[in-house]
C-alpha cells in the first residue's frame, strides 16, 4: 500500500521527538525485534525455566507466585534471589510475614550479608518501600512475602471485629498502578508471594482464589501456581517434596505449561536430579540399567549417585545445563520474536478471567 511521503515524514519526526523526550523504546512498531528481548533470571529449576519459555522470570515485570501452605513458594523466591546474586544483582526481601529464616536462606545459596531485608509494620509501608527501591534504579529483584500479610494501616489501628471491606484490594490496586511503570523504567523484577483462600458458596468450578483483589492478577506478567504433589522418602524418613508448578498466566511466551521438580529439605530445588532426568530424556546422558554415563564415562549407579557426581564435578554439570538450555530454549536467555507476547488474550486457569 502506497503511503503519503508527507505523513511518513511527519510520523518519523514525531517518533524521534517522543524517543528524545521519553527515552529509547518508549514507542515502537509492534513487529520490531528489540521489543521482544526479555532479560530473565533463572528460577533455580531448569524445567520451570523451560516451561516459562524465556529461560526464567522476566526483568521489569510483576510476577505472582501462589499456592497452599508449605508448597515451596518462599523456597522458589529464595532460589531466584540466589541466582540473581550470582549475576551480581542487588536483591531485596520485604518480609511482611516476619517469617524469613536467614539460616535456611543461606543454605539455598543466598548471600544474606548483601540481601536487603525489611519487616514493615503496615501494607502501605511495605508498598512504599517497594516503590522507593524501584525508583532508585539500584535494586534488581524485590520479593514481597506475602500479599495476605500486607495489612492496611486503618485495619491495624482499628479494633478487631471492625469491617474494612475492600481496603486491601484498593491498596493493592493503587500500588499496582504506581509500580508498573516504574518497574519497566528501572528494569526491576517484583515478585509477590500470595496465599490461597476459598470462595464461599461456589458450587461449580474452582472455589480457590488469591488474596488482595483482582489488580495483581491483571498487572502480573507471569502467575505461577505451585503445589506439593507428594513426599520424597529415604527409607521411612521424609526428606523433601515432589512439586508441580503451573504457568497459569504468561505474557512473555505461551502459557499453561507446567514443570515438576523436587524440593529437598534444607537444600532447596534438586537441580542436579533435574539435569540427570532431562539429560536422559534428551539423550545427553546414556542410561543402561541402573548406570548413568556421560560422553561414554560412567557417572554413577542410580539417579542419586549420578546427581552426586554432578555436584562434585560442577564443570560437567555446567556443560550439561548449557547444552540443555541451548536445545530447549533456542538461544538461551532470549526468546524468539514470534514466541513473545503470544498471550495477548490469556485465560486465567483459576478464575476464568481473560487478560
Swiss-Prot record:
GO cellular component annotations of the record: cytosol
SUPFAM superfamilies xref list: P-loop containing nucleoside triphosphate hydrolases, RecA protein, C-terminal domain
Record-level Gene Ontology MF annotations: ATP binding; ATP hydrolysis activity; ATP-dependent DNA damage sensor activity; damaged DNA binding; single-stranded DNA binding
A Pfam family annotated for this UniProt entry: RecA_C
Biological process per Gene Ontology, one example term: SOS response
Binding site for ATP: 67-74
Lineage top rank: taxon: Bacteria
InterPro entries (UniProt xref): AAA+_ATPase (IPR003593), DNA_recomb/repair_RecA (IPR013765), DNA_recomb/repair_RecA_CS (IPR020584), P-loop_NTPase (IPR027417), RecA-like_C (IPR049261), RecA-like_N (IPR049428), RecA_ATP-bd (IPR020588), RecA_C_sf (IPR023400)
Keyword annotations of the record: ATP-binding, Cytoplasm, DNA damage, DNA recombination, DNA repair, DNA-binding, Nucleotide-binding, SOS response
UniProt function note: Can catalyze the hydrolysis of ATP in the presence of single-stranded DNA, the ATP-dependent uptake of single-stranded DNA by duplex DNA, and the ATP-dependent hybridization of homologous single-stranded DNAs. It interacts with LexA causing its activation and leading to its autocatalytic cleavage.
Family membership noted in the UniProt record: Belongs to the RecA family.
HAMAP family recorded: RecA (MF_00268)
Name of the molecule in the record: Protein RecA
Record lineage: Bacteria, Pseudomonadati, Pseudomonadota, Gammaproteobacteria, Alteromonadales
Amino acid at each position: 500500500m502506497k503511503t503519503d511521503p508527507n505523513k511518513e515524514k511527519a510520523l518519523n519526526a514525531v517518533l524521534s521527538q517522543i524517543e528524545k523526550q521519553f527515552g529509547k523504546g518508549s514507542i515502537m512498531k509492534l513487529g520490531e525485534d528489540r521489543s521482544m528481548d526479555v532479560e530473565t533470571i533463572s528460577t533455580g529449576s531448569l524445567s520451570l525455566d523451560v516451561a516459562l519459555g524465556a529461560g526464567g522470570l522476566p526483568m521489569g515485570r510483576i510476577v505472582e507466585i501462589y499456592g497452599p501452605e508449605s508448597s515451596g513458594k518462599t523456597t522458589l523466591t529464595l532460589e531466584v534471589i540466589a541466582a540473581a546474586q550470582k549475576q551480581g544483582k542487588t536483591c531485596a526481601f520485604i518480609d511482611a510475614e516476619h517469617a524469613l529464616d536467614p539460616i535456611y536462606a543461606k543454605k539455598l545459596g543466598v548471600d544474606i550479608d548483601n540481601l536487603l531485608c525489611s519487616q514493615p509494620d503496615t501494607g502501605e509501608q511495605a508498598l512504599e518501600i517497594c516503590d522507593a527501591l524501584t525508583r532508585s534504579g539500584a535494586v534488581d529483584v524485590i520479593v514481597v512475602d506475602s500479599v495476605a500479610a500486607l495489612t492496611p494501616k486503618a485495619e491495624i489501628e482499628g479494633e478487631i471485629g471492625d469491617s474494612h471491606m475492600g481496603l486491601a484490594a484498593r491498596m493493592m490496586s493503587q500500588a499496582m498502578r504506581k509500580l508498573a511503570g516504574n518497574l519497566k523504567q528501572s528494569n526491576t523484577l517484583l515478585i509477590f508471594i500470595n496465599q490461597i483462600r476459598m470462595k464461599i458458596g461456589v458450587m461449580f468450578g474452582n472455589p480457590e482464589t488469591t488474596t488482595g483483589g483482582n489488580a495483581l492478577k491483571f498487572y502480573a506478567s507471569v502467575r505461577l501456581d505451585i503445589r506439593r504433589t507428594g513426599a520424597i522418602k529415604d527409607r521411612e524418613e521424609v526428606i523433601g517434596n515432589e512439586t508441580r508448578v503451573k504457568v497459569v498466566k504468561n505474557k512473555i511466551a505461551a502459557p499453561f505449561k507446567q514443570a515438576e521438580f523436587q524440593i529437598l529439605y534444607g537444600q532447596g530445588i534438586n537441580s542436579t536430579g533435574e539435569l540427570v532426568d532431562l539429560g536422559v530424556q534428551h539423550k545427553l546422558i546414556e542410561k543402561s540399567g541402573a548406570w548413568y554415563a556421560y560422553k561414554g564415562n560412567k557417572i554413577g549407579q542410580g539417579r542419586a549417585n549420578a546427581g552426586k557426581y554432578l555436584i562434585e564435578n560442577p564443570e560437567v554439570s555446567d556443560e550439561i545445563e548449557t547444552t540443555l538450555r541451548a536445545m530447549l530454549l533456542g538461544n538461551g536467555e532470549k526468546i524468539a520474536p514470534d514466541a513473545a507476547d503470544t498471550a495477548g488474550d490469556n485465560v486465567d486457569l483459576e478464575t476464568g478471567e481473560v487478560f
